[in-house]
Amino acid sequence: MSLNIHIKSGQDKWEVNVAPESTVLQFKEAINKANGIPVANQRLIYSGKILKDDQTVESYHIQDGHSVHLVKSQPKPQTASAAGANNATATGAAAGTGATPNMSSGQSAGFNPLADLTSARYAGYLNMPSADMFGPDGGALNNDSNNQDELLRMMENPIFQSQMNEMLSNPQMLDFMIQSNPQLQAMGPQARQMLQSPMFRQMLTNPDMIRQSMQFARMMDPNAGMGSAGGAASAFPAPGGDAPEEGSNTNTTSSSNTGNNAGTNAGTNAGANTAANPFASLLNPALNPFANAGNAASTGMPAFDPALLASMFQPPVQASQAEDTRPPEERYEHQLRQLNDMGFFDFDRNVAALRRSGGSVQGALDSLLNGDV
């Protein structure tokens, strides 16, 4: 007698036949034949419990027609057998790893989407960017050259746009991006909302927006337009223009009058070029506390504001909307139902895990299984 068990993983579903006396490891091998997921990457959940390889299927009281949830995980970087065979090496590696705990912390259990690019697996099959594209000082991002046009043409490629949308739709990839960037980590759940925002995706695939962002990055460079002496040259040159040269002598009165006229003109024309330059309002010296930073003895960029960055990629209509005050059972109704189907019935833990993951069921599931909440 064999059991017909439904395997669920996100939106995917499979049916696997297995004998009740079979071990969970044999059960995973049958699943591998059905969907091709390696046995080492399978985590099976039934009634809120992770199935152990050495236990039998019938020991978990799994009946015919029941559903078992499959969570795909990454293989461990080092097996227990390898660690036991090299005790001295393992001890030294553990000491070395303890010295740099932040290098791989939170990397989604070793998830590295760029691993294949640094190996010989696809050597000769991928056309990598030219060497000067990412040259000194950022290459194409900081120089007005043909390399910048090459990058913009790549943004216009429908295949590239499709790949970007697919990447931002992958929860595991979003976790990797957030956990690899301290600034995104500081944003909390807003980082995931920003990366999933339609406006943010449009910006990544819109050549005009990319061009404006490059110009804005050059203008916000604290060293742009300033010589080694840090004199009176403007730190915010015109978009697309070269940084002004520093003169040997500086007329303080003339610079002051020029700054006042620039503030008046920017205030008069603020909004006239909003469609052409989405960052035009940020370049108004009257509203910019760093407008006269070039005359100071030392300059610096303002502190990173996660809330401000997240608000830049929110649709305008959301700015006037009130904060979502719905109770958790309404806000996370769909996600809570999925967790209940997997056997997680602790309401408080489920809500805490969903808030921690920004509403992602996959992230909440990892938090519940790892005991983070």
From Swiss-Prot:
GO cellular component: cytosol; nucleus
GO MF entries: K48-linked polyubiquitin modification-dependent protein binding; polyubiquitin modification-dependent protein binding; protein-macromolecule adaptor activity
Pfam families registered for this protein in UniProt: ubiquitin
Subcellular localization: Nucleus
Compositionally biased tracts (Low complexity): 231-270
Ranges where the Ubiquitin-like domain occurs: 1-76
Main location: nucleus
InterPro entries referenced in this protein's UniProt entry, alphabetically: STI1_HS-bd, UBA, UBA-like_sf, Ubiquilin, Ubiquitin-like_dom, Ubiquitin-like_domsf, Ubiquitin_CS
Matching Gene3D superfamilies: DNA helicase RuvA subunit, C-terminal domain (1.10.8.10), Phosphatidylinositol 3-kinase Catalytic Subunit, Chain A, domain 1 (3.10.20.90)
Keywords, ordered alphabetically: Isopeptide bond, Nucleus, Ubl conjugation
Record domain UBA: where: 327-371
Annotated PANTHER family: FI07626P-RELATED, UBIQUILIN
Function: Involved, with RAD23 in spindle pole body duplication. Involved in the ubiquitin-proteasome proteolytic pathway.
Additional facts recorded: Present with 3930 molecules/cell in log phase SD medium.
Name listed for the protein in its UniProt record: Ubiquitin domain-containing protein DSK2
Organism: Saccharomyces cerevisiae (strain ATCC 204508 / S288c) (Baker's yeast)
Gene name in the database record: DSK2
